Amino acid sequence: MSKIIGIDLGTTNSCVAVMEGGSATIIPNSEGARTTPSVVNIKDNGEVVVGEIAKRQAVTNPTSTVSSIKTHMGSDYKVEIFGKKYTPQEISAKTLQKLKKDAEAYLGEEVKEAVITVPAYFTDSQRQATKDAGTIAGLDVKRIINEPTAAALAYGLEKKKEEKVLVFDLGGGTFDVSVLEISDGVIEVISTAGNNHLGGDDFDNEIINWLVAEFKKETGIDLSNDKMAYQRLKDAAEKAKKELSTLMETSISLPFITMDATGPKHLEMKLTRAKFNDLTKHLVEATQGPTKTALKDASLEANQIDEILLVGGSTRIPAVQEWVENFFGKKPNKGINPDEVVAAGAAIQGGVLMGDVKDVLLLDVTPLSLGIETLGGVFTKMIEKNTTIPVKKSQVYSTAVDNQPAVTINVLQGERSRATDNHKLGEFNLEGIPAAPRGVPQIEVTFDIDANGIVHVSAKDLGTGKENKVTISGSSNLSKEEIERMTKEAEAHAEEDKKFQELVEARNKADQLISATEKTLKENPDKVSEEDKKNIEAAIEELKKVKDGDDKSAIDSAMEKLSQASHKFAEELYKEVQAQAQAQQQAGANAGSDKKDEDVAEAEVVD
């Protein structure tokens, strides 16, 4: 049986590992390195070069070299090279193909199966895109697991005592924080938070922007529009960032960076760690919000965390380590390699799936709440965020109007009460619902999140058995603003959301009251006086005028008036029902029946 390899498909670098002799082994690539740059170059003859070689020649071939494609996973972005357009999945597949080939050379056998990691805050469409990339690369992706969880898996394999662990994962393009409980082989994710658009690339870009601005100040030349010069700046910025993790100052030297009428120009600058910290201060601060959110969702204080694991190459930045240490009051664990631990964890999960690793149970969670849009534009959550996966939940809903022939299931992801404030994953229709009064048809909606975190939604008419289902694979990922809105604004807008929820509930109650009252009037015209009927109809009209407005107190007041106007009518109906029941009981007694206790009086209750 062939091995299941573990792959960390990173924004900047990727890594592959496999279980050997009960532990995870990092597989070196064909160049002898333990990580492979996630860089792809495609030549005009179709030849593909991946990794360090592609990265080295990016300066001379910037338009045919692609890096950091992971930031576009799950979107409709395409990169055009020599007239051909490539999706992020296709480019990522080329990196995966190299990792697969290197693993086969190391193991001496064909590799067909893999566990691939993704950021914990990846959306459903981004997870699906990652799985698709694996398929394109010729891999059967047995499981998609979250990067922080994989890191904890590698860290916690031998741990027997109970610990609360926080994984701080700052990679090349994404940031995740996960809080986990590790105890006797069980690794349970309690909460997760993050930002899909924050990582090492952003730190590089700050250096690039500074270099461009300083060079323009000195020479008047703008390097940002020169693709070849920009690629050299990018390489120099990444190198300077890495050097400043150990040095207090670094020199950036780029001879012949450009030229003008006076001749060639050279870029020579010094960058201190203090200046770098100043340039990137806002990026370090951007990690604080998700960290606090993850702790809050786990109902823990910073001092209750037993161990902090730093994952991702960007956690080597001194300012990041300093903030983590100051916030938690303890030094983070530096005993793990931040570039390799995720791939090692993925390999361990592969071992679990093969049965080679026993007594390890991984319980992961979904990062955002999932649900559907219901009457009044409300987001009705069916699966709350931080719910352990895999999970399957069903809920029965009904139609909003009489004789409704179809329902549209609008699938959403987020934390806000108003449907439009959340991220839309997709929608589908369930048609052919038999004509019936509102509230009568029973539509069962089922959400099923598999172990990969991929969402499957179905809707079934319980009356006819008709069913429609969809695997959500949306075409757009969450922007930084959308993520911040979902995680931070939910709390800031809590009162606003509560008021909106109450308003929608009042509108729905008003609709129900109008419908029920009109129906009862129609069915019992001889049981209401002309005066009462006029009062009831006037109250109905008044409620209809205000029910779709934004004034909840006006709706409540109009409902109360309608209820008061209907009281006498309702009393008359109940009196008649009771009289009929008594008459039936009396008739039974007169007949000498001994089954009078079994008689049931049926009546329609009108609120």
From Swiss-Prot:
Question: InterPro entries, per this entry?
Answer: ATPase_NBD, Chaperone_DnaK, Heat_shock_70_CS, HSP70_C_sf, HSP70_peptide-bd_sf, Hsp_70_fam
Which terms under GO biological process does the entry name? Answer: chaperone cofactor-dependent protein refolding; protein refolding
Compositionally biased, Low complexity: which spans? 579-592
Q: Which SUPFAM superfamilies match?
A: Actin-like ATPase domain (SSF53067), Heat shock protein 70kD (HSP70), C-terminal subdomain (SSF100934), Heat shock protein 70kD (HSP70), peptide-binding domain (SSF100920)
Q: Does the keyword Transmembrane helix apply?
A: no
Keyword Zinc, does the record have it?
Answer: no
MF GO annotations: ATP binding; ATP hydrolysis activity; ATP-dependent protein folding chaperone; heat shock protein binding; protein folding chaperone; unfolded protein binding
Q: Mark the residues carrying the PTM Phosphothreonine.
A: 174
Q: What induces it?
A: By stress conditions e.g. heat shock.
> Residue ranges of region Disordered?
579-607
Origin, by domain of life? Bacteria
CDD domains cross-referenced by the UniProt entry: ASKHA_NBD_HSP70_DnaK-like
Instruction: Give the keywords, sorted.
Output: ATP-binding, Chaperone, Nucleotide-binding, Phosphoprotein, Stress response
Q: Which PANTHER family match?
A: HEAT SHOCK PROTEIN 70KDA (PTHR19375)
UniProt function note: Acts as a chaperone.
Q: Which family does it belong to?
A: Belongs to the heat shock protein 70 family.
Q: What name goes with this protein? A: Chaperone protein DnaK
Q: Which organism is it from?
A: Fusobacterium nucleatum subsp. nucleatum (strain ATCC 25586 / DSM 15643 / BCRC 10681 / CIP 101130 / JCM 8532 / KCTC 2640 / LMG 13131 / VPI 4355)
Query: Its gene?
Result: dnaK
